[in-house]
Amino acid sequence: MRLTIIGCSGSYPGPDSPASCYLVEADDSTGRTWRIVLDMGNGALGVLQRYVDPLLIDAVLISHLHADHCVDMTSYYVLRKWHPTGPQPPIPVYGPKGTGRRLAKAYDLPKRPGMREEFAFSTYTGQINLGPYRITPTAVEHPVDAYGLRIEANGKVLGYSGDTAETDALLDIAADADLFLCEAAFRDGVDNPPGVHITGVHAGEYATKARAKKLIVTHVPPWHDSADAVREARSSYEGPIELAATGAVYEV
């Protein structure tokens, strides 16, 4: 399984990165490569095209419906609907309840058909089996309906926190994960609003408790120093830590 960081800027695009978007690739037993995208935040579709033909994406999984995690689905809709090669078959898009309706509204489309001719929308209800992937969505703590994702393929595990406040759900998402991709939007030692995000210290603590083998710190807003988030995580996690950066590739 391979993870490519497409966008990792927290809350809005930064000068060096779009908002949240991650490309995951894995081969099935026949050698076919399956490609899924986790989130499609502001500016992500442009950068995604550096690494893959968007028409080769097999599915998209949206962690929650804040713009920095989903709004470029409106651009992806245009790409699939009006591509010169002709209309594309709908691909699966998984997300919280109301994902299809919200995205149609964002592009000022009528509720029916909305984007249903391009995307086959499904609400998170349980485990998802797709090609070589077994994906387990788990509700996390955020001001809106939000999910973290545990992705298993070929004996490897990738945990993705999505956006979340402190919650033991992260322990299930990251349990014994080969790689834990975890947000750290807040700084330690300041009066952060409750129920929204976590700090680098928290990310490290969850990685430690979950016995994750490697921690990738992501979703740091441009107004914060990302190096601080990594330093915080190092104070609570002794394993390998890296800061997510656009274009970085990890073999999980």
Give the positions of each predicted feature:
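Adenine-nucleotide cofactor-binding loop residues
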Residues: G41, E141, A165
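Active-site neighborhood of phospho(di)ester-bond hydrolases with catalytic His/Asp-centered motifs
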Residues: V37-G41, D58-H64, D68, P96, ...
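Conserved beta-strand hairpin/beta-sheet module of binuclear metal-dependent hydrolase folds
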Residues: M1-V52, A146-G162, L179
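Cap/insert and terminal regions of metallo-dependent hydrolase folds
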Residues: E166-Y250
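Metal-dependent catalytic neighborhoods of phosphoester/phosphodiester hydrolases
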Residues: D72-R80, A106, D225-A233
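Active-site metal-binding motif and surrounding structural segment of the metallo-beta-lactamase
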Residues: N42-P92
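Metallo-beta-lactamase
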Residues: G86-A146, A153-N154
